């Protein structure tokens, strides 16, 4: 008769043993699998289903929440590291007051676009220095050295510093003189015209002004003698923020880009200037054939509007 062998009983593992640690990990893993309904040998869910699982609110609810809670919307924008839209196609004519702050304009025969300034290569290369692009003829380099870029922030200060500089603003004054001496005196009560011309000379390409007398006052057309035009965000901000008495429109006529400054109300100019001396200096300027031809061509172009 065979004797029954006594069964060996497994002694419980001590709390610090390796077996005890493994058993705890296995129980924890089993609990996690049962909680998440995840099996290590089953195929994982699709990426689309995972994305749906993480979508807690709909797009409509999300944007409604942002519109109702401004602070939440600001926090969301701070977390964004990529702009939603860096470029937008535009059509001419265009009112520059409709352009959002921080954007520049790039115009060419291939198309026109409104870009974010910090995404624009030309704005980045210039460093947004108000006088870094000061170029052209007629004493522009000297003008850049003499003036502070803070002058462009004020219509009154810019007009006061520029009105007596007849030689530097020769094209501006000779274009006025082509009408009459009375037209020059009318421009003295519209300081925003000289201010606009100064800003464009400083921040844009070669520009020539043409004037037209209207019921509300003198209207200025700034003609750009270039096929490709870039208007920086700094230039646009100066024009939009300071020309409260004018409507500024960008247009293209016969492949010529132009900015139209139309007065909508009278300006208040209480500055005292030496009108007689300035007018005498203007009449003494050299009216070259080149300038005459530019004035004639510009007036013919403006007459078609």
UniProtKB/Swiss-Prot annotation:
Phosphorylated at serine residues in the N-terminus. This phosphorylation regulates the localization within the inner nuclear membrane. The keyword Phosphoprotein applies. One of its GO terms (biological process) is viral budding from nuclear membrane. InterPro entries: Herpes_UL31 (IPR021152). Signal peptide: none annotated. GO terms for molecular function: zinc ion binding. Keywords: Host membrane, Host nucleus, Membrane, Metal-binding, Phosphoprotein, Zinc, Zinc-finger. A zinc finger (CCCH-type) spans 104-230. Residues 1-24 are annotated as: Disordered. It holds the Pfam family Herpes_UL31. It is found in: Host nucleus inner membrane. The keyword Repeat does not apply. GO terms for cellular component: host cell nuclear inner membrane; membrane. Residues 1-11 have a biased composition (Basic and acidic residues). Plays an essential role in virion nuclear egress, the first step of virion release from infected cell. Within the host nucleus, NEC1 interacts with the newly formed capsid through the vertexes and directs it to the inner nuclear membrane by associating with NEC2. Induces the budding of the capsid at the inner nuclear membrane as well as its envelopment into the perinuclear space. Forms a heterohexameric complex with NEC2. Interacts with capsid vertex specific component 2/CVC2; this interaction directs the capsid to the host inner nuclear membrane to initiate budding. Belongs to the herpesviridae NEC1 protein family. This is Nuclear egress protein 1. It comes from Equine herpesvirus 2 (strain 86/87) (EHV-2). The gene is NEC1.
